[in-house]
Amino acid sequence: MEEKRENTNSIYIVPELLEDIFLRLPLKSILKFKTVSRQWRSILESKLFVERRGNLQKHHRKILAAYNCNYFMRPSIFPESRFEGDEEIVYLHCDAAQPSMTCDGLLCITEPGWFNVLNPSAGQLRRFPPGPGPVKGPQENWLLGFGRDNVTGRYKIVRMCFHDCYEFGILDIETGVWSKLRSPPHNMLPGSKSVCVNGSIYWLQISAGYIILAMDLHEESYHGVHHLPATWVTQETQLVNLEDRLAMAMTTNVGPEWILEIWSMDIEGKGWSKGYSWSKSYSISLAHGVGFSWPWQKRWFTPVWVSKQGNLLFYDNHKRLFKYYSGTDEIRCLSSNICVISSYVENLAPLPLKPSHTHHDLGNSNSKFSTSRCHLFPTRGSWISKVLFTSILFGYICLPL
């Protein structure tokens, strides 16, 4: 009799409906709901849910910025985001001077003796050694890359050294294992910024001439992009991922006027028949809205993203964040003191944890990323769980995607 009564009081929701409900919830709630039950956690960490949630969040892009740099604390997310104009900023406690690379909402920060891979959305940090054994040569002589293998979905770190020693390696974040790479066809200068676009990492080399070196993360093969869009590529030219296309941002002068030009690359063909073409996406006059004192002041600009209306968000090397309104041809300064790291999209894919990995959770006990069991949901079938079910069902009915 008691068993019957208990069964009639229980609430069951099919996993497919639960997944649709979870898709509508804010990140903070999703992180808490992972602690309710193994079933909920498996749903929230499933590949299908992560992909569906990621597709929704592509339309809710934010900016990741460094905040209150602290050399003695591990990186941690600021509890609440802020707004500059109508743009949402997510702040990360970290040393902005440390080299960093981003891909799909994940962040790779290098420090002496370690690669730190962070997932700010899931509140996870993994640390990896810089090689399979003792690493030769100083870090300043490394050429680094970080990105996602489009075939396997795995994130990888690339490390190359062309000075003092010749070492070329790739780290699979999934396994934590370093493998050897064959040497690229061109010697590259250390410190060149890398960009990951559609499963390939790109580096811009500027010396006597210029070339873009591309590496396919799945095939571990190299390609050279020799035909660049213009002859005025300089040390200030920035290579970026803009709307899932490789893009170059450069400043040129037409008479007394300075112009920010952004060129985007298209790939034609495959394998040995692969070809590259460039098209000009933006040509923006910097006469109004951006202060200059050329030639004494070196200035370069990095695009962040393009809105649905075609407005461009970009920042410079003097901690200024700008927004260009294409409809009115107007530039507005959103912030004059911000250390932009990159664009930021939510990524719920958990970082793999192997016995060889060093593991940390971001934040502290007061952080929204605390991963201890949430005491709001102590047992399945409790009255609190039933209230929770009722609440999320109400949200499912009332809140649109």
Swiss-Prot record:
Residue ranges constituting the F-box domain according to the UniProt record: 7-53
Cysteine pairs bridged by disulfides in the record: none
InterPro entries: F-box-assoc_dom_typ1 (IPR006527), F-box-assoc_interact_dom (IPR017451), F-box-like_dom_sf (IPR036047), F-box_dom (IPR001810), SCF_F-box_component (IPR050796)
Regions crossing the membrane: none
UniProt cross-references to Pfam families, sorted A to Z: F-box, FBA_1
PANTHER family attached to this UniProt entry: BNACNNG10540D PROTEIN (PTHR31672), F-BOX PROTEIN CPR30-LIKE (PTHR31672:SF13)
NCBIfam families: F_box_assoc_1 (TIGR01640)
Descriptive protein name: F-box protein At2g43440
